[in-house]
Amino acid sequence: MGRRIQGQRRGRGTSTFRAPSHRYKADLEHRKVEDGDVIAGTVVDIEHDPARSAPVAAVEFEDGDRRLILAPEGVGVGDELQVGVSAEIAPGNTLPLAEIPEGVPVCNVESSPGDGGKFARASGVNAQLLTHDRNVAVVKLPSGEMKRLDPQCRATIGVVAGGGRTDKPFVKAGNKHHKMKARGTKWPNVRGVAMNAVDHPFGGGGRQHPGKPKSISRNAPPGRKVGDIASKRTGRGGNE
């Protein structure tokens, strides 16, 4: 009987595989306002959140509410931000897609009205509002996908701060270790072909190779369910 593979250990749900969400600061949802109203707030601090790659801005609103938002590029301490239908078109302001001019870069875009923001939230990324009418708004996501959304979905104007983060190398394995530990990510990941035969279905042998077909049934038992799971096809392909 071989040892449990990593997928089986992950399913047990020990602390090794759980994200330390008790350290995360906030969900960074859009501030809710009444229809037609605009509420202003002042950026009082720029903070780091272990949950994400981008910096977050602490905003204190006129009514005393203080919350964290995703910080766009160009927003700093002391700046005034607005949330509402008639907010100004300026970086950091949040308003419905129907009120934003076409071609403007946006971030933290809602998937459905009122959900707080789901798309374009990583550092240095933005979505682009291509077109909108009374019934639908078309947004180009960072992946290139064209998303058709409700025009009442809200978004923050601007590009998420922290661009260029990936340009700086980790240099040392210790730096990478601390980053992964903050996220609760299992690291490093050892390849199955580099393991012993007792540790993985692809392990063992005089050289590193799977030693068996990588395609595997969807209904395979957990200890064998590695490789190309229920693949319709594998390889580079060619002309159909």
UniProtKB/Swiss-Prot annotation:
Molecular function GO labels: rRNA binding; structural constituent of ribosome
UniProt superkingdom: Archaea
Disordered: annotated segments: 200-240
Record key words, sorted: Ribonucleoprotein, Ribosomal protein, RNA-binding, rRNA-binding
Note: This protein can be partially incorporated into E.coli polysomes in vivo, indicating it can replace the endogenous protein.
Subunit structure: Part of the 50S ribosomal subunit. Forms a bridge to the 30S subunit in the 70S ribosome. Interacts weakly with protein L37Ae.
Protein name (database record): Large ribosomal subunit protein uL2
Protein's organism: Haloarcula marismortui (strain ATCC 43049 / DSM 3752 / JCM 8966 / VKM B-1809)
Gene: rpl2
